[in-house]
Each structure stands twice: as C-alpha cells, then as structure tokens.
C-alpha cells in the first residue's frame, strides 16, 4: 500500500510540473538592479523600460509604442504551447488592425539567427522582438514560464501582468472593452 501511495504521489507531482504540461521554465533570479520589486508589478504600475532587437536587427524600445495598448507575448520557437498560440495571436492582430493596440511578440530564443529563420520559414509578421528574456523584465513581471502574456496601456502602465492567452475567448472581450482602443 505504501509503495502504491508513493508512486501515486510522485506521478501526480510529475504531471503537475511545467515540463509535463508543455510549459518551459525560465531560470529567474532575484534582482538588485531593478527599480521595480521582483515580481510585484500590478495593474497601474509603470512597466519597466526594455530594449530588444527586432527582426531587422534594429533596437526597439517600449517607448516606441506609447499611445497604443501593448499586448506582449513572451514565447520561444522551441516552446510548443507558445507556437500553438501563434495562429490565435495572428487572428487577434487581424481583428484589431487599425486600432490603438500593438501585438508585440518577444522571443526568448538565445540563437537570434535560428529565431530569424523561424520567422522567415513561418512567414511571421507584426512586431517580432528578441532579447533572450531579459532578466530585469523577467524579474519585474515574475516570469517563470512561457508562454506568458502581458497587457500594457497607452502610457506603458500595466493593465494585466498575467493576461489571458490569445486562444481564450476572454482575451478578445477584454481587448474590445479597452477604453479608446
């Protein structure tokens, strides 16, 4: 009986881990450098500034999106749950085209050339950035696994640090309800 109970508990523990559910853990360390408490961003807080490389190898800043809502998608090419959200994200991008919202996909891929190849091969458009999951950004948002979605307002403040996935019908409803979109 003890052996059966032990096996059951170990099995439940394994299947509830991110690896078993298809999520990839990102190593996150606490940060002394940030002005934002680690993992404490909440609605209304200013998002930490970030800079990342776009698909044309130019630096892009959060400031570049001022005046628009920003739906951030943290993903990687090796993350199957992330890749599974891409068609849903593309549908939202088309649905909200011309509105005051930008969909920003930030890749955590370490190999920029591999990431660029993936973008070309899959004809991915829109704002595509890569910054190998910048630690300050991870720390500020408490990012421990991807995919992860974040919604910012037109002034770069956090609306939802744990936004719903593009595949969730609530996402479209939430975006439609944004003031001045």
What are these regions (language model features)?
Residues 84-122, 133-139:
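Structural microenvironment flanking redox-active thiols in thiol-disulfide oxidoreductases
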């Amino acid at each position: 009986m003890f052996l059966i109970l032990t096996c059951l508990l170990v099995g439940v523990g394994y299947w509830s881990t991110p690896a078993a559910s298809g999520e990839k853990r990102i190593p996150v360390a606490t940060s002394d450098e940030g002005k934002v408490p680690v993992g404490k961003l909440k609605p209304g807080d200013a998002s930490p500034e970030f800079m990342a490389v776009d698909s044309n190898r130019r630096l892009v800043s959060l400031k570049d999106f001022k005046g628009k809502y920003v739906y951030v998608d943290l993903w990687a090419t090796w993350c199957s749950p992330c890749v599974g959200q891409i068609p849903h994200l593309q549908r939202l991008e088309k649905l909200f085209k011309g509105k005051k919202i930008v969909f920003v996909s930030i890749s955590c891929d370490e190999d920029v050339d591999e990431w660029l190849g993936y973008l070309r091969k899959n004809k991915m458009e829109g704002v595509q950035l890569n910054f190998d999951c910048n630690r300050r950004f991870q720390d500020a948002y408490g990012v421990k696994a991807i995919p992860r979605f974040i919604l910012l307002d037109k002034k770069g403040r956090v609306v939802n640090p744990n936004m719903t996935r593009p595949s969730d019908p609530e996402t479209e409803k939430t975006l439609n309800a944004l003031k001045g979109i």
